[in-house]
């Protein structure tokens, strides 16, 4: 089942030309997400349409996966006067819960960008140094992700994309949007679940419009079990509940 995790590509919105949402949307069109699913995850993840995993109660079912259209991407960049663009993509070197092979992912993105005339230079970064290096703001793009043991949508949005998260060094996009922050605060203060859900859906629409980060994948939670076991429930956090588990009766095969 879908897990409470997300892998994404962050644009450094503090650096031109990535401070322009139109540029970010154009670059997003160049990424072949279906190939990422086949070459990186091998069926153990689903393409992400939102920064909020599908397992969340506030997930926007109207969220759309960014289409793959390199011809349109090239045309948009040309219309914006951007040709022969070179970008630095900073990538963690080690496997992560939301991305088993970040470097291979970066190479696939590099190849996709080359198809639209954008040169991507891959900059491998050791995990423990990644946050500090990204806060220097020298990167253009970075691959990252997030997993949480909380089902509260705020645990995804606020630590990663709020204005305050820039100072706490977890907002790798360096994106600060007061409208987005206000919506998060409205959701946090609301006492009604329906109102919170509406606010978080609005937050997802803002992210889809501004695109400071491009959601890539949400890893599935997998559990191996016997063929005759019934009623096993796996939570989005990876925990298994055996409360309703039973074994299906099968005829015993008598040995001769």
Regions found by a protein language model. Give the residues of each.
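Short, solvent-exposed loop/beta-turn-alpha elements that line the ligand-binding surface or hinge
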Residues: 1-3, 10-20, 57-71, 133-137, ...
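Extracytoplasmic
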Residues: 4-6, 47, 84, 211
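Pocket-flanking alpha-helical
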Residues: 9-10, 17, 35-40, 128-163, ...
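Append "and occasionally in soluble cytosolic enzymes with long acidic Gly/Pro-rich linkers
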Residues: 18-111, 115, 176, 202, ...
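Short, solvent-exposed turn/loop segments enriched in Gly/Ser/Thr/Pro and often Arg
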Residues: 43-46, 146-148, 217-223
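Ligand/substrate-recognition segments at binding pockets and active sites
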Residues: 78-150, 172, 193, 221
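Short amphipathic alpha-helical coiled-coil/interface segments
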Residues: 184, 188, 193-208
């Amino acid at each position: 089942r879908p897990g409470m995790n997300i892998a994404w590509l962050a644009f450094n919105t503090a650096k031109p030309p990535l401070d322009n949402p139109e540029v970010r949307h154009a670059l997003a069109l160049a990424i072949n997400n279906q190939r990422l699913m086949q070459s990186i995850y091998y069926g153990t993840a689903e393409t992400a349409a939102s920064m909020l995993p599908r397992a969340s109660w506030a997930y926007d079912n109207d969220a759309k996966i960014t289409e793959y259209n390199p011809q349109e991407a090239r045309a948009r960049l040309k219309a914006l006067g951007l040709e022969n663009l070179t970008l630095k993509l900073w990538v963690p070197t080690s496997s992560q819960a939301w991305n088993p092979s970040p470097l291979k992912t970066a190479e696939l993105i590099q190849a996709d960008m080359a198809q639209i005339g954008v040169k991507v230079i891959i900059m491998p970064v050791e995990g423990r140094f990644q946050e500090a290096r990204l806060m220097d703001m020298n990167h253009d793009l970075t691959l990252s992700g997030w997993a949480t043991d909380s089902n509260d949508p705020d645990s995804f949005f606020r630590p990663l994309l709020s204005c305050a998260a820039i100072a706490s060094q977890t907002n790798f996009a360096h994106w600060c949007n007061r409208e987005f922050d206000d919506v998060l605060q409205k959701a946090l203060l609301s006492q009604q679940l329906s109102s919170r859900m509406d606010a978080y859906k609005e937050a997802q629409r803002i992210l889809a419009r501004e695109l400071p980060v491009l959601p890539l994948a949400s890893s599935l939670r997998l559990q191996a079990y016997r063929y005759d076991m019934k009623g096993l429930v796996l939570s989005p956090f990876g925990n298994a509940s055996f409360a309703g588990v039973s074994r299906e009766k099968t005829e015993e095969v008598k040995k001769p």
